[in-house]
Amino acid sequence: MPVLGLDNITGRIMRAGEGRILRRLQRIAAQVNSLEEEFKALTDEELQALTPEFTRRHADGESLDDLLPEAFATMREAARRTLGMRHFDVQLMGGAALHFGNIAEMQTGEGKTLVGTLPVYLNALTGKGVHLVTVNDYLAERDAEWMGRAYRFLGLTVGVIKSQSTPAERRAQYACDITYGTNTEFGFDYLRDNMAWSQDELVQRGHHFAIVDEADSILIDEARTPLIISGPADQPTQWYGAFAKLVTRMRGVRVQEEQFVTPADKDRLAHLRTTHDYEYDPKKRTVAILDRGVEYLQDQLGIESLYESEHTSLIGHLNNALKAKEHFRKDKDYVVVDGEVLIVDEHTGRILAGRRYNEGLHQAIEAKEAEEGTEAGVTVRNENQTLATITLQNFFRLYEKLAGMTGTAMTEAAEFHQIYQLNVVPIPSNRPMIRRDDPDQIYRTEEAKYAAILADIAERHETGQPILVGTTSVEKSELLSGLLRKQGIRHEVLNAKNHQREAQIVAQAGRRGAVTVATNMAGRGTDIMLGGNPEAMALAALPEDATPEDREAVLDRVGRAAAAEHEEVKELGGLYVLGTERHESRRIDNQLRGRSGRQGDPGASRFYLSLGDDLMRLFRAQVVERVMSMANVPDDVPIENKMVTRAIASAQSQLEQQHFESRKDVLKFDEVLNRQRTLIYAERRRVLAGEDLREQVRHFMDDTIEAYIRQETGEGFPEEWDLERLWGAFRQLYPVGITIEDLEDSVGGRPDLTVDDLVAAVTEDVHDRYARREAELGADALRDLERLVVLSVLDRKWREHLYEMDYLRDGIGLRWTLGREPIVEYEREGFDMFGAMTEAIKEESVGYVFNLDATGREGEGSALDRRPTDGLHFSAPTLDTAEGVVEGRFTTAPAGEPAEHDKAPPHRPGKSRNRRRRKR
């Protein structure tokens, strides 16, 4: 009997509960339906008066679950009156599923945007704010304006966070009952709030309830890489160019586990490793330097050992240069426009404007392009240092309640449950799906595959049937576009290079005779409607200064024409979706297919594959090749073979599992940092709230004095202690009043002196000096100074700690070679480093409290003069990028000129604990 994995068991349990959940949702829909006629009879004023009534009832103790039927009936009627749209029963079910904190899987075209209004209205009654999370600014603005008509009719306020919003605008939008925005904007505002220097700078007001649209894209695909706010780092750029040049002369061997299974294969691999400089795995997207490569680099760089501590940073440059060489291809992973390397989102094909890979990877790609010289003007830009970071998993887990909507969630149900404790509820479609999904056609060569694709497109185009062709990269979309031009077939191309026309192209993709070649359609956000999208087409036809009357007239005319064309296209078979190869994820394939057959319309789909496709090359294409050879299949004849289909499904399953493991790894490591971040951010909020820090600063003094003393007196007899050096350190910390002689006299001489005597005497002295400081400045002035000091020191030390943790994370994988578990080592060392950081915060805070003047400044260039929100970059995930994170520009309100360097008072002699630890 086969043993089931945890994911399979979890999946079975969840599927077993689906029927029970759906029956509950159907009962709720029936309750709402029973109220429909009663609510239809209400006047506008009576309907609008229900919102304050519901709010009062909830404040009096009635639960949201109890209010649900009436609130849903209210929103349904409001939507009918303001939007001309009535929620279907399945939409009521979807809304209830969201309210109960689930992922609602609803097919494309089922009206997910309208579904969201139900739980949003209900949960907004608490007054705590509801966040609607979308994949881009366009959808956030569109949905806030569109659905906002119903919310405002019922007396709720609606805000939208845009990438260019100022802090003041953001604060106003978050104060609304309902706030729309992208996942990155919500996440970055959380991080920026935890870099604020006063409560007036805070923009968010908590994390009560969030509904995530396109939940699989945001919660799954983007979860492998964290959000990061970074600032300039002191990193010399010459090494990027040097290593880009060096790796061009190095030979790599392609290594994949399944290629080296037998003993003979392993012997061959061992030999290959002696004749090559490095190895790389395109499936795992990893690189590893080999002995021969180490010797070559040491010779070229003129160093004895690449692995000496002073050369550690060179290993990072080497790894990035090799990754740039082997794993990042122009016009697939990135494009070069006007001398700038721009990342292409793997799943949507969009250019991620202003975004950059982090940790030196982007610079390595720039150096590669500059070295190859194929693109003029590419230069290596400066690297950035992490100032604040959080993964999307941990950000969304901040919410008291979380829900999501998507058309494709069941394939990731186990991950949603394991990472977010969210169940996936498949909501039935309002009309049955009648799209026909034809079997894959598999060819031996890419040439034969493209010939078949062109023939299929030409035949269907001749009839007028609209065709959507899905490709996996910019490169492939432009290749196919060139072939179509040669055939004389008019078409549109939607990829990263012309994303500005995206909405217009998608709006026309369902029209008669339309041929649209697009990179992955995940998260496009605009339905492909048969006959065209009348709203989008009307918008394109109107001038900017059109009057409302003009808009209504054009919309009416375009709507009637689109309705007639809709029926015509239905007769032709609806939208035909043609996939030019399988994606790494079955979910993305399903999203492409889901563009056809919306709301019961006819449609068809088919994928064309070849043995040269990326997915087939990664996973044992030789098995498929053998099958085709045995069957004597000519190049231009496709096969439909169960074994081949299983091999493709297995390849996708392996990659999905690999990405899942990668996301779990990210979460494991971030959990360590998350515990530390929670403590630091809670401390910041306490300081910002204006809590009296007097007792805390006194504790800082006590701990610092004791640490100084125990470090100096840890060995030897009292006569051997170097008290002169200890007192020198004290004098740099605070104006010492007690002398060594006074102390010795008080105990009868040096031999009788104990550590406890030292601690008690110096602690009493520092408390006395602190009281004098308070009398000199005044209590209020000292409290303000303490608040400024603690915030400044905490922020700077946290930034340094993040740098140290990045450094630790980069090298922790080497612990495998010592037989240690990397995550355990990372947690242990990270705990030690956090302890060292907190000690340093205490030490420096005490020094600043005693050594700064009453204004909190030591002169220009002081550490306290520096504002952490000046000149920052933000870093956000692409949709499932394989390496690193990406950075982008962020502009804030001006807050003074940043200082060149942070200065701390010169406390005890010797290196800081963090630096000592790291170089030990």
UniProtKB/Swiss-Prot annotation:
The record's Gene Ontology cellular component field reads: cell envelope Sec protein transport complex; cytosol; plasma membrane
The GO molecular function terms of this record are: ATP binding; protein-exporting ATPase activity
Question: Which top class of enzyme applies to this chain?
Answer: translocase
Note the topology in the membrane. Peripheral membrane protein
Q: Which keywords label this protein? A: ATP-binding, Cell membrane, Cytoplasm, Membrane, Nucleotide-binding, Protein transport, Translocase, Translocation, Transport
* Protein's GO biological process: intracellular protein transmembrane transport; protein import; protein targeting; protein transport by the Sec complex
Documented EC number(s): 7.4.2.8
Q: Where in the cell is it found?
A: Cell membrane; Cytoplasm
Entries under PANTHER family matching the protein: CHLOROPLAST PROTEIN-TRANSPORTING ATPASE, SECA INNER MEMBRANE COMPONENT OF SEC PROTEIN SECRETION SYSTEM
Q: Which HAMAP family match?
A: SecA (MF_01382)
Q: What is this protein called?
A: Protein translocase subunit SecA 2
What organism does the record attribute this protein to?
Streptomyces avermitilis (strain ATCC 31267 / DSM 46492 / JCM 5070 / NBRC 14893 / NCIMB 12804 / NRRL 8165 / MA-4680)
